[in-house]
Amino acid sequence: MADELLHYGEDYHFIPATSAASGGGVSVLPDLYCHTVQIVNICLVGRPDDGAFVLIDAGMPGSADDIISAVEDRFGSGSRPQAIILTHGHFDHVGALIELIREWNVPVYAHKDELPYLTGKTRYPEPDASVEGGLLAKISPFFPNEPIQLGDHVHPLPEDGTVPHLPEFRWLHTPGHTPGHISLFRPHDAALIAGDAFVTVRQDSLYKVLTQQTEITGPPRYYTTDWTAARESVRKLAALFPSVAVTGHGAPVAGEELRDGLTKLARDFDRIAVLDYGKYVH
């Protein structure tokens, strides 16, 4: 597909939301860097002294310049990733994707079940503003929800669980938040890139998002449509006993804080994460 045919949904627009962490980054490991774009995280996987790296997710609408700046600050002027891997296709994870494709001309990979939402075929279910929670949940119907059109720039991840250009990682299907949601895990050091399978900030609360108050909890409530699958995905990740985790929202967590928090979430998922009411709660 020609670049000029790439397009966002008609409802795509800048979201004036931010957090205390916006614009900052954390070197979680020598080859794992977490950068916050307003209220969402991207990851850069690769050592700065090597120059080869992969970008995980693509931030908020209008954030391309911020992401390119973060990349060049870490890897040098003119650097570009070998590929972009998407944990899923919600607007806050693909918001700068088309600009980045045009800037870098690199392939994009996602789970096959996520491709309809990335090729203009299917829109996600409407956010549930009725869920219990804070202001962000209430305004979620105003978030972009029309599908992005990436055409042949996006490819399905290999069925064998390998991750292009990241041979030490494996991708895991962690549905619930979206049908084709994935997380990335590296067995030798138990490093986890969770996406939104679980997060470390209560994403429906504006105050907690603004302050980035750490709390290991389930996926963002207003966008999660399959709570049974979400529960099983958290249990799958907890069973890996990750040593460090970067999630789609909130600060990276590690060690005892991660182990205890994720174990508790897996054990008490319905009490901690699932809603008492909402149109996707059954």
Walk through the language-model features, giving the residues of each.
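Short, structured coil segments at secondary-structure junctions
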Residues: 28, 103-104, 241
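Binuclear metal-ion centers of metallo-dependent hydrolases, dominated by the metallo-beta-lactamase
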Residues: 250-282
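Residue-level marker for buried hydrophobic side chains located in beta-strands
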Residues: 54-56, 85, 108, 191-193, ...
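Metallo-beta-lactamase
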Residues: 3-16, 60-62, 114-175, 179-257, 269
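Conserved beta-strand hairpin/beta-sheet module of binuclear metal-dependent hydrolase folds
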Residues: 18-75, 183-195, 200
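Short, charged, surface-exposed secondary-structure boundary motifs
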Residues: 117-121, 202-204, 279-280
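Active-site HxH/HxHxD metal-binding segment of metal-dependent hydrolases
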Residues: 64, 72-155, 264-265, 271-272
